[in-house]
């Protein structure tokens, strides 16, 4: 994730102590509930950033020139258009 100074929950609170992890490595230990809440918020924000990337990768995968994928893509698009037309007419 980067250096410890870069993590927002370490910068935001003074309630950080260290604990020894596996291999004797020192890791920050969150003791204050606000730090934990902020860490959860950061994870949610990261998930929101990752989601558009996943969509882009999915679209790139769909655009590959594989005959099976092209067939599936056109079939799904046809069904979607038929479904949309049906919804609009009702």
UniProtKB/Swiss-Prot annotation:
GO cellular component terms given for this protein: host cell cytosol; host cell mitochondrial inner membrane; host cell nucleus; membrane
Pfam families reported for this sequence: PB1-F2
Quaternary assembly: Oligomer. Interacts with human SLC25A6/ANT3 and VDAC1. Interacts with host MAVS.
Family: Belongs to the influenza viruses PB1-F2 family.
UniProt protein name: Protein PB1-F2
Cellular localization per UniProt: Host mitochondrion inner membrane; Host nucleus; Host cytoplasm, Host cytosol
InterPro entries in the cross-refs: Flu_proapoptotic_PB1-F2 (IPR021045)
Function (record text): Plays an important role in promoting lung pathology in both primary viral infection and secondary bacterial infection. Promotes alteration of mitochondrial morphology, dissipation of mitochondrial membrane potential, and cell death. Alternatively, inhibits the production of interferon in the infected cell at the level of host mitochondrial antiviral signaling MAVS. Its level of expression differs greatly depending on which cell type is infected, in a manner that is independent of the levels of expression of other viral proteins. Monocytic cells are more affected than epithelial cells.
